[in-house]
Amino acid sequence: MKTAVLAALLFTSTLTIGTVAAQPAPYNEIGVTMGHWHIISKDVEANKKLFLGMGGKLFMPGGNPLMMFPGIYINLNLGTEKGDGGTQGSVVNHVGFIVDNVQERVAQWKAAGVPVLPGNNNRLDQAFVETPDGVRIEILEDKTQSMPIRHEHVHFFLPEAELPKAQAWYAKTFGGEAGTRNNAPVVDVPGGQLRFAKADTKQAPTRGRVLDHIGFDVRDHQAVVKKIEAEGITLDEPVRKSPTTGNTVTYITDPWGTRIEIIERAPLGALVQ
């Protein structure tokens, strides 16, 4: 896990120096870093208020609301589409942040109007936040980190026989480092960890749900697309450049139903809030 540890240290040092918050973690060797969660909000303003209350920063690239936390962007709309169905019951069961002190952050968030659920079995080092339209966010604690909050993980729920296959697929496709956490398979990528847990029943694909897809930012879109196509992965749609944001994007879908955006991101513009 030396690569993942080094990336985490570089990421932390970049943020503690106080440089612009709107930066993902440094790219890995193939030019990939954790990118975003794309929420198709039924109530954009409610979600904006929630994430601002948790310490997020708001940008408006191309006139679209984009929240930023260390290690992750969160898109709050997708044109005129509205998602149906929360994360639970889909292959991406939940996503996660890690904070320096759960109880202190929970108190601050509640004061800002963020609804917070207790941890499992009333654990004091864990909590949950759920968006108004059902995106479940796990909150964990690392008292050694120097920032109040950062992105930590995306948690996939899959049939047991598929767990090693999914781990291998994500490690190969995005240049991640395979490992284990609590005896469960994981893949470390800059800016976050992909975790894989057993589901007793087949879970629904993400497309069309409130968390419609996850995304990876890339340094060289053409090179990454060439790599994954050579590995037999078919693009869901042709590569295109957004006329409003300047981003270069395409989508793929993993073998288990997670929609994934691959994006080379243009500058975000000024911080709004």
Where are the regions a protein language model picked out?
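Eukaryotic phosphotyrosine signaling hubs
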Residues: M34, V91-H94, H153, V210-H213
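Solenoidal tandem-repeat scaffolds enriched in leucines and small polar residues
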Residues: E162-N183
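Mid-chain, structured segments of secreted extracytoplasmic proteins
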Residues: G63-A112
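Vicinal oxygen chelate
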Residues: A21-I30, V106, K110-L158, G179-R181, ...
